[in-house]
């Protein structure tokens, strides 16, 4: 048994220049592990609490309170625990906090410790993180959902939908699929410039031009896919983030007002016209009636992903499964607070034939933990932004490294 011998946490910066937590764990054999916690912009109401200082520093976004919790209460209670018993560690963190959403210690504090301990344990054994967390069956490279046009809360433009993504299905390897996305991304930049559109980037590395409506990005993507020579090998995915468009039971976009039935009809039209594989957060997190209707209409045709709807929460997902809402769940560890709770949600989804998509947050870092985690849990899909900005490419580069020892790419088998 190796025990947690020491730990520390301190402020670092995320990709938006906001403070976040870096946690470091030291084990009794001298092994170490560290982790940097991400942060979201478009967040679900039921996410675990990200503890911020709310004072004059960094416009209130400092995390010194959470760091004090790590270096104080958490350290006092986990030093001496078995580093290889992740469940015991994470249960201890949950019990220490005393709430379901980590409103005392902060989910950013607990997740940092949870991630760093897993990494330290893997380092102690001299094995990759994905192998430590996933065992012998962790070997499948996920299909990336590459967000190459940004809108909504991730960009300062007039596009309502938050993410327009491409997914490389028709390839035999992850690296070839990634290459196709890189080539399409480069063509898109030239296409936007030729049309006189901005090629400025959004939070996740995608382009963020002002466009006529929410279908022009889809037309642009189809043009670029064709120019790159990858027709029939690439599918499209959307993150509508519709909770951001929802007010008083209605949806406000493109200068119009939509009921949930109107919006569902809009999605049906889009799916008939474009090769759309997936729609995320197609309806607001509180619009349960709408989600049931959407799943009845499109659930047998495309992937319907709940992000704000489920917030990586096992209990909320279980309720959604019983109500037949969505058929897939986005997996964001910082929505729930520990590695163990994240894994439980994935297992519940898989037992009920719900797909899983491992996901970054818009406020990210160079930490590539989720790349290993996606392979460990065989999620089959990963969202980690565009092929630009180092905090995004860090995850892709880690997956390329993992592929050197694992040559199975899900691709068309998804």
Swiss-Prot record:
Gene3D superfamilies: Enolase-like C-terminal domain, Enolase-like, N-terminal domain. Pathway: Carbohydrate degradation; glycolysis; pyruvate from D-glyceraldehyde 3-phosphate: step 4/5. It catalyses: (2R)-2-phosphoglycerate = phosphoenolpyruvate + H2O. Its EC number is 4.2.1.11. It is an enzyme of class 4 (lyase). Mg(2+) binds at residues 239, 280, 307. Its main location: cytoplasm. (2R)-2-phosphoglycerate binds at residues 162, 332, 361-362, 383. It is found in: Cytoplasm; Secreted; Cell surface. The keyword Magnesium applies. It comes from the Bacteria. GO terms for biological process: glycolytic process. The active site is at 204 (proton donor), 332 (proton acceptor). Its cofactor is Mg(2+). Binds a second Mg(2+) ion via substrate during catalysis. InterPro entries: Enolase (IPR000941), Enolase-like_C_sf (IPR036849), Enolase-like_N (IPR029017), Enolase_C (IPR020810), Enolase_CS (IPR020809), Enolase_N (IPR020811). Keywords: Cytoplasm, Glycolysis, Lyase, Magnesium, Metal-binding, Secreted. One of its GO terms (molecular function) is phosphopyruvate hydratase activity. GO terms for cellular component: cell surface; extracellular region; phosphopyruvate hydratase complex. PANTHER family: ENOLASE (PTHR11902:SF1). HAMAP family: Enolase. Catalyzes the reversible conversion of 2-phosphoglycerate (2-PG) into phosphoenolpyruvate (PEP). It is essential for the degradation of carbohydrates via glycolysis. Belongs to the enolase family. This is Enolase. The lineage of its organism: Bacteria, Pseudomonadati, Campylobacterota, Epsilonproteobacteria, Campylobacterales. The gene is eno.
């Amino acid at each position: 048994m190796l025990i947690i011998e020491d730990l520390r946490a301190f402020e670092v910066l995320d990709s938006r220049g906001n403070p976040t937590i870096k946690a470091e764990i030291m084990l009794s054999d001298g092994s170490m592990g560290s982790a940097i916690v991400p942060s979201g912009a478009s967040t679900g109401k039921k996410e675990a609490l990200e503890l911020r200082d709310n004072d004059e520093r960094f416009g209130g976004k400092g995390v010194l309170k959470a760091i004090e919790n790590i270096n104080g209460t958490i350290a006092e209670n986990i030093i001496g625990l078995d580093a290889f018993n992740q469940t015991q560690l994470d249960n201890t963190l949950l019990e220490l906090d005393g709430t379901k959403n980590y409103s005392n210690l902060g989910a950013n504090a607990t997740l940092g410790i949870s991630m760093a301990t897993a990494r330290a344990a893997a380092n102690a054994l001299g094995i990759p993180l994905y192998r430590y967390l996933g065992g012998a069956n962790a070997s499948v490279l996920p299909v990336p959902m590459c967000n190459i046009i940004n809108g909504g809360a991730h960009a300062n433009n007039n596009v309502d939908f938050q993410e327009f993504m491409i997914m490389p299905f028709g390839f035999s390897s992850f690296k070839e699929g990634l290459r196709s996305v890189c080539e399409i991304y480069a063509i898109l930049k030239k296409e936007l410039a030729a049309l006189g559109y901005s090629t400025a980037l959004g939070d996740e590395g995608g382009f963020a031009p002002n466009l006529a409506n929410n279908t022009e990005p889809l037309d642009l993507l189809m043009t670029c896919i064709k120019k790159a020579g990858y027709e029939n090998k690439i599918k499209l995915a959307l993150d509508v983030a519709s909770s951001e468009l929802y007010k008083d039971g209605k949806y406000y976009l493109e200068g119009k007002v939509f009921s949930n039935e109107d919006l569902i009809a809009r999605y049906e039209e889009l799916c008939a016209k474009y090769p759309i594989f997936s729609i995320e957060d197609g309806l607001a997190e509180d619009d349960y009636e709408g989600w049931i209707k959407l799943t009845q209409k499109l659930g047998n045709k495309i992937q319907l992903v709940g992000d704000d709807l489920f917030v990586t929460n096992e209990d909320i997902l279980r309720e959604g499964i019983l109500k037949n809402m969505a058929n897939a769940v986005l997996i964001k560890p910082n929505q729930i607070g520990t590695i163990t709770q994240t894994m439980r949600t994935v297992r519940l989804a898989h037992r009920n034939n719900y797909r899983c998509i491992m996901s970054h947050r818009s406020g990210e870092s160079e930490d590539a933990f989720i790349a290993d985690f996606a392979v460990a849990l065989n999620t089959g899909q990963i969202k980690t932004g565009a092929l630009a900005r180092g905090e995004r490419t860090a995850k892709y580069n880690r997956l390329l490294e993992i592929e050197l020892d694992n040559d199975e790419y899900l691709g068309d088998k998804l």
